[in-house]
Amino acid sequence: MTDYINKKERKRDPSFDYAKLSDEVAERAKEGLIEEKGFFIPPSALFCNALKNAPSNEDLNVTLQNIFNEIEKSSLGTPSEENVKGLFADLEVNSNKLGSSHKNRVEKLTKILQAIGGMQLGDYLKSGIDVFGDAYEYLMAMYASNAGKSGGEFFTPQEVSELLAKITLHNQESINKVYDPCCGSGSLLLQFSKVLGDKNVSKGYFGQETNLTTYNLCRINMFLHDINYSKFHIAHGDTLSDPKHEDDKPFDAIVSNPPYSTKWDSNSLLKDDERFKKANVLAPKNAADLAFTMHMLSYLSNSGTAAIVEFPGVLYRGNAEAKIRECLVKENVIDCVIALPNNLFFGTSIATCILVLKKNKKDDTTLFIDASKEFVKEGKKNKLKACNREKILQTYIERKEVKHFCALANIEKIQENDYNLSVNRYVEQEDTKEAIDIKALNSEISQIVEKQSALRNRLESIIKELEA
């Protein structure tokens, strides 16, 4: 907020600094700021001032709680109320985890503020959102992991997020709206702001998240990335049993990294749900992967593209999942299957894949890309570097077969493979074994046999001499 206000005011007065104003003076601009940004923070409550006063503030926890309460209170009765309501519900400044006594908690909070203040993030408005955004999202993933959740459910690496966004955009320079039914921290949605610029996502960002803590973190993430409250629509709830964006569909771009093979309430009544009835079968109770896939297909516009990170088991598992794959293949909506390298995601080392869906395919072919070797090792993790992402993206766009890397298969060929969509069924693996020269091998064997014969004759000769 400080940067936003200073940027405007310094056009008139280059020395203006919102952080140095009195709360009474700043109050005059409160109504306008709430209308523009969705909330109001007086100068005394800004992070820089809270940090400066922290060492001498014996009731820092009370001060911080009051700041959070006042920010939320400032939005009451305004259009931004729903996007600010409960935003800080999970921030427990009086938690015993911070210390057993009031004094210990205040000391720990002071150290936390000082640690954040000391981070070399720079002015993220000048350097771009990546540094600040990545740091925030990584911290969220760490929080989720320590809370006993899979980091992959909360944090999709930036390089994977970018690839998904660019696949759905397919060189478009603008888009209507984007949707993620399992939005986690919002990192996938925010990639569209990075790739296109926020002004080129005309109707905004739509998402749903079942975990309350992560839902709040996602909304904070939107505000921190300077997405206006009027442009993001993040809902809390179970996407499969209680979808919140029915009235907002269809979407031109859908991206998601749903939880892998999670349990869900596959009530038999859902068979008649518009999202699932085409397959005439529901995804297994212990593996909701393809339920999310069918949900996204239902919400996709006729000219749109969905790019979904999937657990590879959905490509080959049998029974209900095989029937759902059969439905997807016969409906001719599977545009591409991309096998990714293993160990890409935070909190898991499994190899994943990307399933790309389209309703307006030009023919009945599906492109299979084996990108399992497209990575660079960095520390303990594998990374999709810019060259890897570009190779995958261009291969997807050009749709030309490349030996040992990608192949096209029509519906008939996929049917011959019993609707198995595993990439290695269609992309021939390169034989990396050393070629054997049979002629040279036979010559070598002959030489060995001759040598053995000579040695045997010599041994027999020695024995005869000894016997004599």
Predicted segments with their positions:
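Non-catalytic, mostly N-terminal accessory regions of nucleic-acid modification and defense proteins
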Residues: 1-163, 167-168, 230-239, 339-343, ...
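A conserved structural/catalytic subdomain of Rossmann-like adenosyl-cofactor enzymes
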Residues: 242, 246-468
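Non-catalytic alpha-helical coupling and interface elements of nucleotide-dependent molecular machines
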Residues: 2-6, 121, 140-144, 197, ...
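Conserved S-adenosyl-L-methionine
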Residues: 150-256, 261-263, 267-270, 275-279, ...
